[in-house]
Amino acid sequence: MLKSRLRMFLNELKLLVLTGGGRPRAEPQPRGGGGGGCGWAPFAGCSARDGDGDEEEYYGSEPRARGLAGDKEPRAGPPPPPAPPPPPPGALDALSLSSSLDSGLRTPQCRICFQGPEQGELLSPCRCDGSVRCTHQPCLIRWISERGSWSCELCYFKYQVLAISTKNPLQWQAISLTVIEKVQIAAIVLGSLFLVASISWLIWSSLSPSAKWQRQDLLFQICYGMYGFMDVVCIGLIVHEGSSVYRIFKRWQAVNQQWKVLNYDKTKDVGGDTGGGAAGKPGPRTSRTSPPAGAPTRPPAAQRMRMRTLLPQRCGYTILHLLGQLRPPDARSSSHSGREVVMRVTTV
């Protein structure tokens, strides 16, 4: 509507410029009787008759210029787009196939490299099901060499692998080690060498007849005590860091040995109750009847983990309580508040 008004205003302005404003324009009369008309410019949906009457009222009966008379001519617009052709029957089959693949009937893929069977045979080595069920044997061996664990991180099932043979020493590959792992290996090696040398010298010095004068010397007796203390420290260091170095060795062994990974066999799964989560397969079916009253029941995995966590705390609390009982009565009564605070912190 606003566009139509602006167009008519410009046409009036052109007409006034061309005619010089000699003849006054008659005011438009409302159409349709008394008060029935709107008095506004014609809408696009008005009839041709109403439009001609309005133009005659505005411009009169004098001939107009081509630019003014051609405003009512329809403008040629862009042609309508052609209708799309009907899809062939093969396209419908392909669409239904893609929808069926998206709905879950997809080709199995390796959960590590996300490749299909074209990259190698897909195995199912653990209880996991669904999209994380299959994996390639080389991908699994590489994953084990990086993590150092031979169990699935989702269902906690230990992979069933068979060692075929060790690779040629010329084909051995090094594994990536962090700074902490290098320090652990160095501590184990140096501690073992010192422990072997110290124990060998102590045994020779205590049993050899030629070392009788050493056993009687005070300086050597002090050395015996120092070497004994260092031997205890080395044994504790080896015990503490032994598990970490053993995992590093298992990683190296996974890379430099040929393996055969076996598929998951539900009939041979004796630890099916330890698998957890929605990603794991259910273990072997057990009887739904309740066990006998006298039969021992095995606590679940979560309860066993909680017991392992609480056991050191309870042991520490018990030792602290026994040490408090060994104190004299006066000292125990004077430091009762401080001991209570320490016991509470240890329990938390």
UniProtKB/Swiss-Prot annotation:
CDD domains: RING_CH-C4HC3_MARCH4_9. Coiled coil: none annotated. SMART domains: RINGv. Zn(2+) 2 binds at C126, C128, C152, C155. A zinc finger (RING-CH-type) spans 102-162. It catalyses: S-ubiquitinyl-[E2 ubiquitin-conjugating enzyme]-L-cysteine + [acceptor protein]-L-lysine = [E2 ubiquitin-conjugating enzyme]-L-cysteine + N(6)-ubiquitinyl-[acceptor protein]-L-lysine. One of its GO terms (cellular component) is Golgi stack. It is found in: Golgi apparatus membrane; Lysosome membrane. Residues 63-75 have a biased composition (Basic and acidic residues). PROSITE patterns: ZF_RING_CH (PS51292). Its EC number is 2.3.2.27. It is a multi-pass membrane protein. Homodimer. This is E3 ubiquitin-protein ligase MARCHF9. It comes from Mus musculus (Mouse). The lineage of its organism: Eukaryota, Metazoa, Chordata, Craniata, Vertebrata. The gene is Marchf9.
